[in-house]
């Protein structure tokens, strides 16, 4: 049961899906799209970035805020990256393979391509691009998908280069890895047609299925990201970036709606109280020269303790806007953009070693009355000043309602401030890459891939898989291998489609749960396994042990692993003699049980030959010997 009536609240929501493409080379250079261990980096360099003007002479507001603090950006490079990632060389022509994949995706979403594609520069000064901008190209628009709530529009599809991966922050320095920078990706933006949190998840799942249906997108953590745009009738558009898991989408939207409703309540309360934000910044460093508070002692040593006076704000700074997050947390997020650790406010004091007497002294010093709130920041003078200015600005916005922001998704479903929403000044033309013609003939030549849902149906009808197994293999990363193997063993009595599918999506996960690194298994390992089963060199019961052995020692070939495990081909005469001996030694038991003795006897035989002889063969041989004994008796 949903907490809110989203239709009544006027919820508008849309998604932006960023999906890496599985091309051999990067978008604007010929480097491979390999993700490297940062320890393999063979050199590094650093940059300082600043906001630049667009072709209209304007600076993007988000870029301006992000460059208020001078940060040092350190880049880790590899023998698989080049001067283009370093921004020391102009880009090459756009990757044709990536363009073909992107056009195929556009077709799946019923989109119309542009006649002429122009590459643009999108200003990004968070350090994730060495150049200070990301190259992006608008490719298609005006598409749709069908959902349980009606059609959901697909407004745009852009081809972009992936950003560098943030490794860590050390003080005012941020370290990035260049292995990811420049990997091709598509950005797919829906229309604001999403009607509820559950509908958002449905749309995201369907878009993800369409993308995986191409067989040409990367898989795994970090290869797909969802941004969510949310607003309600009296609220504002907020872009929430970096939703990694589908499970989080519903919570993100629910909690953003809750945040906006609580902020609207706070606004109304402030209006009724006739609240006011004082512009003056108060230097109260001298009041804490002898403080026992360790956090304030550090601030005094750094140089400044500054304060802001918010009239009639008392009790509201500490009001919860999302579970575990308050209006004061929103103030703190803004302050942190200046490089400080956070803020103190009187709704949570005395605390942190700050005494009631010290709070009263501060109130008296700046003229704060009962019912007023005081915000304090302790840090280096310039950082503290920028931080307190940011808090004053956010407090003013609290009186107006909800600011338009870009926020980051947190693991618990809450969100935190990142920067203002970017404006039109963020984009300007890329002059180093020529325009690309997209003719109707070219677009028509792009094949539409079969959807995974359709493949699953085909696996049921043509290959005899049950529905659950068909869906698992269709959505598995092993899908291409499965299709290759069923083509090879289509008429093989020993290797059928069900055995192949169960091995890939049933046995492999079971081995992984036992702590075995199944990522070490290659397609060649699986192919060798099924060759051995087809030739009756091993039994089906040996699959799990053999795959576990190959995963632990991936340098072994399948025949070598079979030999090491003692799973060599069986001698039919030896097996027949063992079965006869087993039957003779249990004559009384067989006379008592008759044909029902087959099960217990099978357990004895399987214990001897499990993994060496196929259970079906053992069962047939034992039944034949048992029937012969009973008939003679």
UniProtKB/Swiss-Prot annotation:
<dbReference type="GO" id="GO:0050567">
    <property type="term" value="F:glutaminyl-tRNA synthase (glutamine-hydrolyzing) activity"/>
</dbReference>
<dbReference type="InterPro" id="IPR017959">
    <property type="entry name" value="Asn/Gln-tRNA_amidoTrfase_suB/E"/>
</dbReference>
<keyword id="KW-0648">Protein biosynthesis</keyword>
<keyword id="KW-0067">ATP-binding</keyword>
<dbReference type="Pfam" id="PF02637">
    <property type="entry name" value="GatB_Yqey"/>
</dbReference>
<dbReference type="GO" id="GO:0005737">
    <property type="term" value="C:cytoplasm"/>
</dbReference>
<dbReference type="InterPro" id="IPR018027">
    <property type="entry name" value="Asn/Gln_amidotransferase"/>
</dbReference>
<comment type="similarity">
    <text>Belongs to the GatB/GatE family. GatE subfamily.</text>
</comment>
<dbReference type="InterPro" id="IPR006075">
    <property type="entry name" value="Asn/Gln-tRNA_Trfase_suB/E_cat"/>
</dbReference>
<dbReference type="InterPro" id="IPR014746">
    <property type="entry name" value="Gln_synth/guanido_kin_cat_dom"/>
</dbReference>
<keyword id="KW-0547">Nucleotide-binding</keyword>
<comment type="subunit">
    <text>Heterodimer of GatD and GatE.</text>
</comment>
<dbReference type="GO" id="GO:0005524">
    <property type="term" value="F:ATP binding"/>
</dbReference>
<dbReference type="InterPro" id="IPR029351">
    <property type="entry name" value="GAD_dom"/>
</dbReference>
<dbReference type="InterPro" id="IPR004115">
    <property type="entry name" value="GAD-like_sf"/>
</dbReference>
<dbReference type="InterPro" id="IPR042114">
    <property type="entry name" value="GatB_C_1"/>
</dbReference>
<keyword id="KW-0436">Ligase</keyword>
<dbReference type="Pfam" id="PF02938">
    <property type="entry name" value="GAD"/>
</dbReference>
<dbReference type="InterPro" id="IPR004414">
    <property type="entry name" value="GatE"/>
</dbReference>
<dbReference type="InterPro" id="IPR003789">
    <property type="entry name" value="Asn/Gln_tRNA_amidoTrase-B-like"/>
</dbReference>
<dbReference type="GO" id="GO:0070681">
    <property type="term" value="P:glutaminyl-tRNAGln biosynthesis via transamidation"/>
</dbReference>
<comment type="function">
    <text>Allows the formation of correctly charged Gln-tRNA(Gln) through the transamidation of misacylated Glu-tRNA(Gln) in organisms which lack glutaminyl-tRNA synthetase. The reaction takes place in the presence of glutamine and ATP through an activated gamma-phospho-Glu-tRNA(Gln). The GatDE system is specific for glutamate and does not act on aspartate.</text>
</comment>
<protein>
    <recommendedName>
        <fullName>Glutamyl-tRNA(Gln) amidotransferase subunit E</fullName>
        <ecNumber>6.3.5.-</ecNumber>
    </recommendedName>
</protein>
<dbReference type="Pfam" id="PF02934">
    <property type="entry name" value="GatB_N"/>
</dbReference>
<dbReference type="GO" id="GO:0004812">
    <property type="term" value="F:aminoacyl-tRNA ligase activity"/>
</dbReference>
<dbReference type="InterPro" id="IPR023168">
    <property type="entry name" value="GatB_Yqey_C_2"/>
</dbReference>
<dbReference type="GO" id="GO:0006412">
    <property type="term" value="P:translation"/>
</dbReference>
<dbReference type="InterPro" id="IPR017958">
    <property type="entry name" value="Gln-tRNA_amidoTrfase_suB_CS"/>
</dbReference>
